[in-house]
Amino acid sequence: MEISERARARLAVLNAHLTVSEPNQVLPAIEPWCTSAHITAAPHGSLKGNLKIVDERTGNEYQVPVSEHGTVKTVDLKKITTGKDDKGLNLYDPGYLNTAPVRSSISYIDGDEGILRYRGYPVEELAEKSTYTEVTYLLIYGNLPSQRQLADWEFAISQNSAVPQGVLDMIQSMPNDVHPVGALVTAMSALSIFYPDANPSLMGLGVYKSKQVRDKQIVRVLGQAPTIAAAAYLRKAGKPPVQPLSNLSYSENFLYMVESMGDRSYKPNPRLARVLDILFILQAEHEMNCSTAAARHLSSSGGDVYTAVSGGVGAIYGPLHGGAVEATINMLSEIGTVENIPEFIESVKNKKRRLSGFGHRIYKNYDPRGKVVKKLADEVFSILGRDPLVEVGDALEKAALSDEYFVKRKLYPNVDFYSGLINRAMGIPSSFTAVSRIAGYLSHWRESLDDPDTKIMRPQQVYTGAGIRHYETVRERTKL
């Protein structure tokens, strides 16, 4: 995209925003976090070789190739069979605990060591030094942008932040008690109606072969997502939508739309805007999680990007995914006071209550994002005052980490534990994790379009139903 005069005029602002060492910098006074940057080589050496399998049912031996990444192709196991009526081995993997449907270069996780990197960069380092819009560029295009690229990128997102009036009218027609993320799912899906020229179902599969068409949809989604989310939030508050301002950063604009009530002179607190920016960075991408897998699954059919993204948002809406942030707040509210923690701990150990905000399917160590969020929480509470639930949260964390039951199960605080308290203090729905995660969905969508291995996702099943049966009339069935 060509740089504009308006974009050049913003470079000075961007320079100030990205420089963290200036004495008058408005970024939170948070110490640099310990990062996982000590490993600069590839995560592991080549694991390429062959796997020898002996089928004790038949005595047959098989050689299965192992890739340099330590994976085998499941179709190679189909040749392991007991005879002509056996169609070969199939893998049963509920929840995809050990199945990789894609190869990706976007993010790397080592759950045992508590490592998360975006395109090789430790997430803690990006949270300390970068901005959300810069990270979105990194995730989508693979490298950090130059100063000029960043200015163009932010300008393009800003220029595409206005939402079609028809979408805003749709949000306004929703019930007053609509959940903001439910509204976000509906509105994001509806965008495909307003951009038919970029819909493969209407224009043919080749429409996304154009990188210009792809890039246009990416900046549209990134630009409009916070505008839609803010409109959904305001709808629940009984207020009309607020249009974004072109002179504010991504996170500042989100706070402006949520807080200003249309007062164009309103200025969001820059320290809180930076906190939100860091939260967005931490939640932007997390490899093949449920919602990202849902987005890639939908895009594999050749559908439009808006449907794929709305599907991802719908998945993160679930209480076991992004909804866990709200569940954590509800849990702390139910506990109420520090004095009730021992009783709560015992009820969890007796499987009568659920401990939200602890543990993770991937991380068997501290969630690296959780450490950053805890420091952010202190910053927010120094500005807005300390939420009484923070005392409950601190005490619950100490109690859980000193109890052998939780330590043995490696149940450490995750990113949800304190981010919910931050959102609550700032008056932002915890469920709006979805806004930041859209960058990850778009990165995977773009990557899948260029991956020659991309196929329409069509998992197998293990059939456990009845054998063949033949139809009988109602009268015949009644006789039985």
Curated annotation (Swiss-Prot):
Signal peptide: none annotated. It catalyses: oxaloacetate + acetyl-CoA + H2O = citrate + CoA + H(+). One of its GO terms (molecular function) is citrate synthase activity. GO terms for cellular component: peroxisome. Its EC number is 2.3.3.16. Citrate synthase is found in nearly all cells capable of oxidative metabolism. This is Citrate synthase 1, peroxisomal. The gene is CSY1.
